[in-house]
């Protein structure tokens, strides 16, 4: 696995890699309507002549950037501090998952096959019959219905209310989940959606709520019951063993896990994983370089900068490799539901024109990022025609800033104003960059630096004037309503608005029958959000870099979205490599 480094205006691969053959990927959304494989080969990017027996065993030691928040509940947070652990406990997907071989394709997971109605408004899933919860209870269609109902509608008993999942907006088209038999469920949608599988394959949507353990507690009035309260009983390749707050999360192999590799050998290979909680990136770097870690943490702040990566290369040479993934977008988003000058679209537009986007790459993204898709890392599976935002606002910075000043004066704010901004303590560089940038426009950006607990609740509230957002956009346009949609449908959306025209664009996307029409509508939608209304200002695309020891083998590295493939079921430790 190589690393793409931005040097002298272009990207270079380090270390140099031999040519690798690849199978052309199908376009997102072009998966067959009916799929019925019984096995799925595990990713083996580091195949050797080692016998299968040598792959088994060992404890993988990974850094985690913080304690998993929200009592380990994936319905309450998308934090990577949870989801780096959640993949091992709860699995890499739900009914379906992103393929380990190609993140843009959908593979079976808990469902072994599925089919849709001709108009894509009904999807029927046939479940595997060999899936067990970690306490030995069989997984059934009743678990599926329970999870979807809990995520979509929450729960109410004796006047106590449990809120729906934060990602409800992604699944808002679901009208009903019907149990057909012990191993079959039918999901009915209120609109056609031939991309429903790709949306469902979002790795944040994890089954962490076993009906047989959760439902009795809910009926008894404990509407806040969490996965931690019931012992973190999941469906993933590893079972929960121990959690010491501020120290470590330990998981160990679940011997009755259902997945096998391409040769029929049971997964996972590892005996277990220890997630060492390290809130300081410097502590992680020191632990890795002194042999106390096998892999770094995922998460902004802990991803390597160019300077930190050079330290790894200097000290470890060929004993380290770097997993590189396209990350999320560094952005500024507005709460237009809160009174203030930012409710005027001219003001928001002025801010978008004023920001020097390229300056964010070294200042905020550690040197790894891009503002033009032509400069991004090689990614043959991604259709760059859907990468629209860099094509807006391409005039020279001086011209853009002159127009920004004019718009501010026209809106009556030539002297500027004060605007609040919720900023994560774990990643202060973004907030400081925005504050420094907007000072020249006369805007005093008041940074409200918060811990992870307040960040996870504050960003889904209407309490703050602006924010950077947290979620990584799904790889397909149809899966982005959860981050660009209306607040009432998607509380974790970047901007807080109630613009029904955005709903109309997503409806047109779902109705599109050709790739060309999808691209056309997607461009119109992005132009509306980023330019016409400027609810969100995309600034630069991040490239996430995570270090691993070279003896870590079988690691599927997603082309984008670091929440993907955190189950580590196919990972093994090559004992012949020191």
Regions found by a protein language model. Give the residues of each.
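Surface-exposed binding/hinge segments that line
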Residues: 55, 126, 164-217, 239-244
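Long beta-strand-rich cores associated with HINT superfamily self-processing modules
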Residues: 548-578
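Gly/Pro-rich hinge or "lid" segments in bacterial periplasmic/extracellular proteins
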Residues: 97-101, 201-274, 280-283, 401-402, ...
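Periplasmic-binding protein-like
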Residues: 325, 341-383, 429-430, 528-538
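Extracellular/periplasmic solute-recognition and catalytic clefts
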Residues: 157-160, 164, 241-252, 276-338, ...
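Structural transition elements
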Residues: 44, 238, 368-410, 427-429
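Extracytoplasmic/peripheral linker and loop segments enriched in polar/acidic and small residues
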Residues: 340, 349, 361-364, 395-398, ...
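N-terminal lobe/hinge region of extracytoplasmic solute-binding protein
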Residues: 45-47, 59-118, 149, 231-235
